[in-house]
């Protein structure tokens, strides 16, 4: 009788675990479908990446100006102001609604973007403490904030760029200057935009 009771308990526990496993599998499948949908809908954030090319080009131009360092750094901050309007315009041109709320994960992407705003406090500190290194730190923060998008958009490109920009910026910023960092960031973003285009093409083919 005892043995039978144990068997029933074991069967019940096994059944419950099976239900949990199936539930987790279903939820994971739904999330993966949502990730695929948002990657296609938002074209893996291509409007923002294309805008970042323009922004880093502006920062590059500012960095070569023969003006006071504090004024130069202030202008570098101002270069980021057109991010949303430019991304919206580019989004319209390539048929992407950057403010779309159709996909629940869209809000998560917005939170990832806001995350960068917190790290900008570090850049503000560098602005006053080590002004000549501000572009370097700014580039490092910019690159690092891209990392969560590698999960959201299922993109290896985001992973590589999120790691390479901070590392390259640190090396160039410590050995050379902010102008070199801005030029490198601009070039990387151009290449990255091309990589995302190829990833999207591959996703469409599949």
Specify the residue positions occupied by each region the protein language model found.
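N-terminal membrane topogenic signal
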Residues: 36-50
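Alpha-helical transmembrane segments and their membrane-interface exit regions
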Residues: 80-87, 140-149, 187-197
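Membrane-proximal helix-loop-helix units in multi-pass membrane proteins
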Residues: 120-166
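Short, Lys/Arg-rich, polar N-terminal cytosolic tail immediately upstream
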Residues: 16, 20-39
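Helix-adjacent hinge/juxtasegments
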Residues: 96-128
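Selected alpha-helical membrane-embedding segments in polytopic membrane proteins
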Residues: 52-107
